[in-house]
Swiss-Prot record:
Keywords: Isomerase, Pyridoxal phosphate. GO terms for biological process: D-alanine biosynthetic process. Belongs to the alanine racemase family. Pathway: Amino-acid biosynthesis; D-alanine biosynthesis; D-alanine from L-alanine: step 1/1. Pfam families: Ala_racemase_C, Ala_racemase_N. The lineage of its organism: Bacteria, Pseudomonadati, Pseudomonadota, Gammaproteobacteria, Pseudomonadales. NCBIfam families: alr. PROSITE patterns: ALANINE_RACEMASE. GO terms for molecular function: alanine racemase activity; pyridoxal phosphate binding. The modification N6-(pyridoxal phosphate)lysine is found at K33. The keyword Isomerase applies. Its cofactor is pyridoxal 5'-phosphate. It catalyses: L-alanine = D-alanine. This is Alanine racemase.
Length: 357
């Protein structure tokens, strides 16, 4: 069997969830959209059920997968519904629903629902992606209350730049949100992972931890909370071939790396078809046989090369960690000019192996 695999540490996942709740001091929805950022939504939900106050996914298809697996905890649809016909399923399965557009509000008003909904009413406080305009927010709230179709409303918005701690934009968004909700007595939810970790003064009754659940920081540098995160995914494979090359020899497609001395090169069963970034440059960190080393040359579809020259204990069959508990996904992402979110979500073809610790 091909040795590439991703180990998913469910104990670390629970630790990170508890850290988010402890840090914020309020209830927390575990964000497991996009198949739990590549970690497997069903298994992650099963590991957290009984501890999590609820879950958040992007769409009804992701939510239905959880219900089919027996997950009974509240599930919030972060993008709400795309067609009015989905409302029947939302009611049937007791999903919570974001309302971010006037057409969704009108659909609820016109729907014949068997029981009232829980709605998270989203304000566009400055990200300008989805959300109601501040001038429409109070009216939308009043219309939902008057509709007879809604039993609870939570007020929410989303930060655009909370991962930039010196940027005033988040404070400006809070001010817009506070002005828009003035006089409304509902619960609120503003804080995502960077806001949980870096903006403790932002008010919230609910937080929505995403990337921090999986043990990765949204910040370029660690802070006190980031230092306590535990990586959940360890992407690893093995050395399947060893080459002894003299100085001046090219390695891989395009001869992007030329040996500058006699070198030992390890070929690893991992490539961009598995989700490892093709544009990761020479020097991207890896761990080989327990020792830190580096990527060499261009990443191929199914293979990549690593430097074994100064790792004498490494050889055929040695384990290579591409990211995980020793090689942080954020370090790989920085080297490859991407973000940990994309590394995790791009993972494919690699089997997920679940473990506890």
């Amino acid at each position: 069997m091909r040795p590439a695999r991703a180990l998913i540490d469910l104990q670390a996942l629970r630790h990170n969830y508890q850290l988010a709740r402890e840090t914020s001091g309020v209830r927390a929805l575990a964000v497991i959209k996009a198949d739990a950022y590549g970690h497997g939504a069903v298994r992650c939900a099963q590991a957290l059920e009984g501890e999590a106050d609820g879950f958040a996914v992007a769409c009804i298809e992701e939510a239905l997968e959880l219900r089919a697996a027996g997950i009974r905890a509240p599930v919030l649809l972060l993008e709400g519904f795309f067609e009015a016909s989905e409302l029947a399923l939302i009611v049937e399965h007791d999903f919570w629903c974001v309302v971010h557009s006037l057409w969704q509000l009108e659909a609820i008003e016109q729907a014949a629902v068997a029981k009232p909904l829980t709605v998270w009413l989203k304000l566009d406080s400055g990200m300008h992606r989805v959300g109601l305009h501040p001038k429409d927010y109070q009216v939308a709230y009043q219309r939902l209350q008057a509709s007879g179709k809604v039993e609870k409303i939570v007020l929410m918005s989303h930060f655009a730049r909370a991962d930039e701690l010196d940027c005033p934009r988040s404070s400006e968004q809070v001010a817009v949100f506070e002005a828009a909700r003035q006089g409304l007595g509902a619960e609120i939810s503003l804080r995502n992972s960077p806001a949980v970790m870096g903006w403790p003064s932002v008010p919230s009754d609910w937080v929505r931890p995403g990337i921090m659940l999986y043990g990765s920081t949204p910040f370029e540098e660690n802070n006190s909370v980031a230092a306590r995160l535990q990586p959940v995914m360890t992407l690893e494979s093995k050395v399947i071939c060893v080459r002894e090359l003299p100085a001046g020899e090219p390695v891989g497609y395009g001869a992007r790396f030329i040996t500058d001395r006699p070198m030992r090169i390890g070929v690893v069963a991992m490539g961009y078809a598995d989700g490892y970034p093709r544009h990761a440059p020479t020097g991207t960190p890896v761990l080989v046989a327990g020792q830190r080393s580096r990527l060499l040359g261009r990443v191929s579809m199914d293979m990549l090369c690593v430097d074994l020259t100064d790792v004498p204990q490494a050889g055929l069959g040695s384990t290579v960690e591409l990211w995980g508990k020793n090689i942080l996904a954020s370090d790989v992402a920085q080297a490859a000019d991407t973000i940990p979110y994309q590394l995790f979500c791009n993972l494919r073809r690699v089997p997920l192996v679940y473990c506890e610790g």
